[in-house]
């Protein structure tokens, strides 16, 4: 716990500094990875797009998806949905970084006093709780980003899109499905966010003081690689939940919907096989570079601005 003399940093409370630093680094890294992000979403949700008549045939992998998307829509189309993603990701990641330390303080476990296992469990719990809390505020933006990214402009459809932008997604969804349409898939999202964010933050905070020591301490490359490994593992562990929630999102505005997340799991596995739950996972691993960048850039900003005196965020 910080004492009273350490409550102000650059004239701002640590909570505010944490919020701003986390959000800025997240927005920059997500914009850089936007093309990978969209390809991942297209491959992941292609079966729902085919059922809705918005895609004429399946993609034969990440390379084929990239080739067809740029041919049909142009290079800049790889950033479609990025505006919504930045708007969504700024508060999401910023709130994650900010609230995680609040939750961590609530658990109050110390590695030297309570042991490594309990300290690590506290990190996992605080990371998961922070992610689930922030999800309540930004879920509809995640929904809108998903619909925009999967709004393919296929040659067969004459180039017509379903949505004309972020506001149009909200307008059409509210008209067809009401508020429920904006929150379809929220259940598996909560489960997925706890698994992913819990590992994303918890494992990074727990492993970092063990691995990034000696010559590796404050090393950008080592911090980046550790962050990439953590995001990759967390992403694979939670990927089936991510697939189900996004497939449920894609049914808003459609005549046929999944009855529940369990029904979605059952139907996808029965009709497409278990491997369909992992479609786009390869692109998701590449996308992990963005998440790793968030953590490592955040740590470097702490070193430059606070000389590691401030221990918010991933510190």
Curated annotation (Swiss-Prot):
<feature type="topological domain" description="Mitochondrial matrix">
    <location>
        <begin position="243"/>
        <end position="283"/>
    </location>
</feature>
<keyword id="KW-0472">Membrane</keyword>
<dbReference type="InterPro" id="IPR002067">
    <property type="entry name" value="Mit_carrier"/>
</dbReference>
<keyword id="KW-0050">Antiport</keyword>
<feature type="topological domain" description="Mitochondrial intermembrane">
    <location>
        <begin position="105"/>
        <end position="115"/>
    </location>
</feature>
<keyword id="KW-0677">Repeat</keyword>
<feature type="topological domain" description="Mitochondrial intermembrane">
    <location>
        <begin position="305"/>
        <end position="315"/>
    </location>
</feature>
<feature type="binding site">
    <location>
        <begin position="196"/>
        <end position="197"/>
    </location>
    <ligand>
        <name>bongkrekate</name>
    </ligand>
</feature>
<dbReference type="GO" id="GO:0140021">
    <property type="term" value="P:mitochondrial ADP transmembrane transport"/>
</dbReference>
<feature type="repeat" description="Solcar">
    <location>
        <begin position="218"/>
        <end position="304"/>
    </location>
</feature>
<feature type="binding site">
    <location>
        <position position="62"/>
    </location>
    <ligand>
        <name>a cardiolipin</name>
    </ligand>
</feature>
<feature type="binding site">
    <location>
        <position position="245"/>
    </location>
    <ligand>
        <name>ADP</name>
    </ligand>
</feature>
<dbReference type="InterPro" id="IPR023395">
    <property type="entry name" value="Mt_carrier_dom_sf"/>
</dbReference>
<keyword id="KW-0812">Transmembrane</keyword>
<feature type="binding site">
    <location>
        <begin position="280"/>
        <end position="282"/>
    </location>
    <ligand>
        <name>a cardiolipin</name>
    </ligand>
</feature>
<feature type="transmembrane region" description="Helical; Name=3">
    <location>
        <begin position="116"/>
        <end position="145"/>
    </location>
</feature>
<feature type="topological domain" description="Mitochondrial intermembrane">
    <location>
        <begin position="214"/>
        <end position="216"/>
    </location>
</feature>
<feature type="transmembrane region" description="Helical; Name=6">
    <location>
        <begin position="284"/>
        <end position="304"/>
    </location>
</feature>
<dbReference type="InterPro" id="IPR018108">
    <property type="entry name" value="Mitochondrial_sb/sol_carrier"/>
</dbReference>
<feature type="binding site">
    <location>
        <begin position="260"/>
        <end position="261"/>
    </location>
    <ligand>
        <name>a cardiolipin</name>
    </ligand>
</feature>
<feature type="transmembrane region" description="Helical; Name=5">
    <location>
        <begin position="217"/>
        <end position="242"/>
    </location>
</feature>
<feature type="transmembrane region" description="Helical; Name=4">
    <location>
        <begin position="185"/>
        <end position="213"/>
    </location>
</feature>
<comment type="subunit">
    <text>Monomer.</text>
</comment>
<feature type="short sequence motif" description="Nucleotide carrier signature motif">
    <location>
        <begin position="245"/>
        <end position="250"/>
    </location>
</feature>
<protein>
    <recommendedName>
        <fullName>ADP/ATP translocase</fullName>
    </recommendedName>
</protein>
<keyword id="KW-0999">Mitochondrion inner membrane</keyword>
<comment type="similarity">
    <text>Belongs to the mitochondrial carrier (TC 2.A.29) family.</text>
</comment>
<keyword id="KW-0496">Mitochondrion</keyword>
<feature type="transmembrane region" description="Helical; Name=1">
    <location>
        <begin position="14"/>
        <end position="37"/>
    </location>
</feature>
<feature type="transmembrane region" description="Helical; Name=2">
    <location>
        <begin position="81"/>
        <end position="104"/>
    </location>
</feature>
<feature type="binding site">
    <location>
        <position position="166"/>
    </location>
    <ligand>
        <name>a cardiolipin</name>
    </ligand>
</feature>
<dbReference type="InterPro" id="IPR002113">
    <property type="entry name" value="ADT_euk_type"/>
</dbReference>
<feature type="binding site">
    <location>
        <position position="96"/>
    </location>
    <ligand>
        <name>bongkrekate</name>
    </ligand>
</feature>
<dbReference type="GO" id="GO:1990544">
    <property type="term" value="P:mitochondrial ATP transmembrane transport"/>
</dbReference>
<feature type="binding site">
    <location>
        <position position="30"/>
    </location>
    <ligand>
        <name>bongkrekate</name>
    </ligand>
</feature>
<feature type="binding site">
    <location>
        <begin position="184"/>
        <end position="185"/>
    </location>
    <ligand>
        <name>a cardiolipin</name>
    </ligand>
</feature>
<comment type="function">
    <text>ADP:ATP antiporter that mediates import of ADP into the mitochondrial matrix for ATP synthesis, and export of ATP out to fuel the cell. Cycles between the cytoplasmic-open state (c-state) and the matrix-open state (m-state): operates by the alternating access mechanism with a single substrate-binding site intermittently exposed to either the cytosolic (c-state) or matrix (m-state) side of the inner mitochondrial membrane.</text>
</comment>
<feature type="topological domain" description="Mitochondrial matrix">
    <location>
        <begin position="146"/>
        <end position="184"/>
    </location>
</feature>
<feature type="topological domain" description="Mitochondrial matrix">
    <location>
        <begin position="38"/>
        <end position="80"/>
    </location>
</feature>
<feature type="repeat" description="Solcar">
    <location>
        <begin position="118"/>
        <end position="210"/>
    </location>
</feature>
<dbReference type="Pfam" id="PF00153">
    <property type="entry name" value="Mito_carr"/>
</dbReference>
<dbReference type="GO" id="GO:0005743">
    <property type="term" value="C:mitochondrial inner membrane"/>
</dbReference>
């Amino acid at each position: 716990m910080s004492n009273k003399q350490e409550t102000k940093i650059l004239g701002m409370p640590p909570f505010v500094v944490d919020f701003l630093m986390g959000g800025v680094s997240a927005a920059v890294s997500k914009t850089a990875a936007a093309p990978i992000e969209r390809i991942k979403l297209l491959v992941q949700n292609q079966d729902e797009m085919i059922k809705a008549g918005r895609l004429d045939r399946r993609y034969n992998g990440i390379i084929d998806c990239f080739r067809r998307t740029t041919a049909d829509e142009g290079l800049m189309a790889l950033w479609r949905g990025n505006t919504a993603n930045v708007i969504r990701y700024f508060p999401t990641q910023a709130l994650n970084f900010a609230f995680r330390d609040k939750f961590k303080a609530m658990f109050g476990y110390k590695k030297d006093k309570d042991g490594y296992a309990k300290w690590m469990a506290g990190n996992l719990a605080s990371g998961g709780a922070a992610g689930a809390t922030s999800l309540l505020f930004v879920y509809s933006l995640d929904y809108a980003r998903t619909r925009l990214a999967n709004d393919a402009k296929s040659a067969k459809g004459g180039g017509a899109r379903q949505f004309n932008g972020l506001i149009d997604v909200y307008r059409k969804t509210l008209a067809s499905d009401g508020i429920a349409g904006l929150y379809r898939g929220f259940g598996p999202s909560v489960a997925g966010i706890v698994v992913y964010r819990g590992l994303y933050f918890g494992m990074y905070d727990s492993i970092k003081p063990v691995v990034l020591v000696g010559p590796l301490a404050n090393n950008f490359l080592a911090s980046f690689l550790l962050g990439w490994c953590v995001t990759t593992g967390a992403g694979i562990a939670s990927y089936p939940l991510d697939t189900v929630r996004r497939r449920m999102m894609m049914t808003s505005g459609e005549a046929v919907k999944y009855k529940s997340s369990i029904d979605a799991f059952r139907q996808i596995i029965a009709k497409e096989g278990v491997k369909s739950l992992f479609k786009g996972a390869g692109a998701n691993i590449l996308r992990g570079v963005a998440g790793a960048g968030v953590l490592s850039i955040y740590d470097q900003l702490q070193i430059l601005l606070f000389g590691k005196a401030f221990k918010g965020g991933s510190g």
